[in-house]
């Protein structure tokens, strides 16, 4: 019996589709792209099925939307399949209420050789008043995959505006911090094991 995904789709078929997309992506030009080429905006009405025991929208629902939007932006930039490598920062600033419309905006901030950092901003809109509140922000890192599921090179990024250049500079700082933190933890563990 073959495996099925959550929606009943045979996983073997999905895996072959991913491999085919990766093969096609490998043939893509690696010419740099601007952030606008991969920007994503998702919107979703928040109903009772998404509520936590406090009556607000469960944070996990927001996190799933963030990962989805960021993954689409990264995949657009890479021109093929990507996987979430890390959630670098996640901030919940204000609750989202049942009845709100959630707007999730994702754009590529910077790229490495095989990695893509995507910034995400979440806003909740009160339908009756139209008032929007910035509720969450996150930075995620994705890795582009080839047909064997191995990391593959991604196109460069060409910021076009001062805001995009600012985001890219901040992304480089976050990357430096991630690498320094990983190295400090590795050294600490080596000391404990010695």
PLM regions: where:
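HotDog/MaoC-like acyl-thioester-processing domains
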Residues: 2-23, 27-32, 37-42, 97-98, ...
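N-terminal leader/targeting segments and the first structural element of proteins
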Residues: 43, 76-77, 82, 91
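Hydrophobic residues in beta-strands and at strand termini
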Residues: 46-47, 92, 142
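A conserved, well-ordered hydrophobic junction motif at loop->secondary-structure transitions
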Residues: 47, 51-65
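Active-site helix/loop of acyl-thioester processing domains in fatty-acid/polyketide metabolism
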Residues: 61-79
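Conserved interaction-surface patches within small, structured recognition/assembly domains
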Residues: 83-95, 101-109, 121-124
């Amino acid at each position: 019996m073959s495996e099925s995904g959550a929606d009943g789709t045979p996983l073997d078929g999905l895996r072959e589709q991913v491999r085919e997309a990766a093969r096609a992506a490998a043939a893509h030009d690696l010419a740099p792209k601007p952030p606008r080429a991969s920007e994503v905006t998702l919107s979703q009405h928040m109903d009772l099925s998404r509520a936590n025991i406090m009556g607000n929208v469960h944070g996990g629902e927001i996190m799933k939307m963030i990962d989805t939007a960021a993954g689409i932006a990264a995949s657009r930039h890479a021109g093929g399949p990507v996987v979430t490598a890390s959630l670098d920062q996640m901030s919940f600033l204000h609750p989202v209420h049942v009845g709100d419309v959630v707007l999730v905006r994702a754009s590529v901030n910077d790229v490495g050789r095989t990695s893509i950092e995507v910034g995400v901003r979440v806003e909740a809109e009160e339908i009756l008043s139209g008032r929007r509140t910035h509720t969450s922000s996150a930075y995620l890192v994705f890795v582009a995959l080839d047909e064997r599921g191995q990391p593959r090179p991604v196109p460069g990024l060409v910021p076009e505006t001062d805001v995009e250049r600012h985001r890219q500079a901040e992304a480089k700082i976050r990357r430096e911090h991630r690498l320094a933190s990983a190295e400090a933890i590795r050294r600490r563990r080596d000391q404990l094991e010695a």
